[in-house]
Structures are given as structure tokens and as C-alpha cells.
Amino acid sequence: MASTAPIGVFDSGLGGISVAREIRRDMPNEHVLYFGDSANAPYGTKSPEQVRELSDVIVKRFVEQGVKAVVIACNTATSAAANELRDTYDIPIIGMEPALKVACDRGHGKRQRVIVAATPLTLRERKFAVLMDRFKADHTIFPEPCPGLVEIVEHGQLDDHDVVMRTLHQYFDQYDLSTIDSVVLGCTHFVFYRDYFRELLPDTAAIIDGNEGTVRHLGVVLESLGKLAPEDAEGSIDLANSDTSARIAQLAQSLLDR
């Protein structure tokens, strides 16, 4: 596989565009093929079997397009399908996971109180339970399923301040937020809500997502294989979606340009 081959990035819908943007920032010479499965969004309320089947169809298409690696820019699909995809395809498959370690390490040994905002399926899967087990003895962790946030992005309502804040309050008013050290955004859609979370949370609370760490890992893997794009290559992002409507195409481009 040539170093100039593209990187496949996919998500249940439009959230993974936040990861594609991170690749563009950190690895500007790379050619990214982005596929959003908005016709089947959200994944977070589906069964693991459904998510595995949908993910396999997408990765198979990427392989046919000659990608050198695939980034599962979806915490839910990572939880449900990453291991099976790695067993099936002979290319690097890079997944996401909630950046819980980053949040806990902020305390430098002091007990941290952390909310993990994610989809219901991400929080139900064994992968998250294993992650929780690593940290729950020394930290207080609150898993918070937030199914409605994916739909707001997919429906193009991200700029509707009242709708977004009303939805966030539904999930987070149960907490004394003044006691929270960090909120982990455990879904790539949620990264687009960072400014809203900043409005909701006290200044002392950190907002953490896994995009930066995932893209850093992608770079390390490609470098180890000698597959980083040459420095004179012109990077690009091609957007595709299972929902071929003009509305989704315009929304995807607006999120990429955001």
C-alpha cells in the first residue's frame, strides 16, 4: 500500500467529521475519505450485532477503495465492532474510546469526579465496563447516556441554543456540577457541543474528548509502517454519506468548515 493511499474515516453520521478535522490539523498531507452513515444514525440505540454489520459494510468499501488505514470515528462502533474488524481486515483499524484516563490523570493522584457523556450502547458495552474497572476504585465516575445529542447534530439544530441547552440540562441538572472535575465527551458528535458544555460547566471543570489521542495514535501507527503521506502531498477530505440528500451534504460541509 503506497504512503499516498487515503485514510478511511467513518462514523454513524456526522460526528466523525470532528475527527477528520483533527487529522487535517495534525496530518495536513493526508488524503481522507470520510463516510457518514446518517441514513442509519444513531448507532447508539442499536444492537451490537446491527452496528457490527453496518460497520463491516463500510470498512469493506474502504478496503475496495484502497485505504491504508481505517479510523472508526465513532465510540459506539469501536465498542461493538473494532475487534471483529481487526480480525477480518489486514490493515490498521484505529478506534475511539472515552478519554477517561486523561480525565483521571488530571488530578495527579487526587480523586477525580468525572462524568462520561456517551451513547447508551457505548456505556453498555463490555469495553467501557473494562475501562471503568481500571479507574473506579480511585475515582468517582458517572456514566451519563445522552441519546438525544446525536440527533440534534444530524437534524442540523446545532446552532439552536435553546434546544441544545434544554437538552443538556435534562441530562446534567441531576449533578452538582460545581463538584465535577471533568466531563469526558465519549461520542464524536459531542465534540461539536464543546462551547455549550463550557457554558453549562464551571470554569474549573475540564472538557475532554478522545479525538486528539486517536489521531496521534493514527500518526504513530502510520509512521511505524512507513505509510505517512510525503510532506509535499496535498491533503484533502472527501465527504460521502449513506444519506445522499442535499441537506446532509450541506450540513457535513458546514461541520467540516466549522
Swiss-Prot record:
Catalytic activities: L-glutamate = D-glutamate
| Binding-site residues for substrate, renumbered to this chain | 11-12, 43-44, 75-76, 188-189
Which GO molecular-function terms appear in the entry? glutamate racemase activity
Domain of life the protein comes from:
Bacteria
Instruction: Please tell me which top-level EC class this enzyme sits in.
Output: isomerase
Tell me one Pfam family matched here: Asp_Glu_race
Q: Name one GO biological process term.
A: regulation of cell shape
Keyword tags? Cell shape, Cell wall biogenesis/degradation, Isomerase, Peptidoglycan synthesis
> What pathway is this protein a component of?
Cell wall biogenesis; peptidoglycan biosynthesis
Q: Which residues form the active site?
A: 74 (proton donor/acceptor), 187 (proton donor/acceptor)
Catalytic activity, EC? 5.1.1.3
PROSITE patterns for the chain = ASP_GLU_RACEMASE_1 (PS00923)
Which NCBIfam families does the UniProt record give? glut_race (TIGR00067)
Q: What HAMAP family would the database entry show?
A: Glu_racemase
Family, according to the entry, reads as follows: Belongs to the aspartate/glutamate racemases family.
Q: What does this protein do?
A: Provides the (R)-glutamate required for cell wall biosynthesis.
The protein depicted here goes by the name Glutamate racemase
Q: What is the lineage of its organism?
A: Bacteria, Bacillati, Actinomycetota, Actinomycetes, Bifidobacteriales
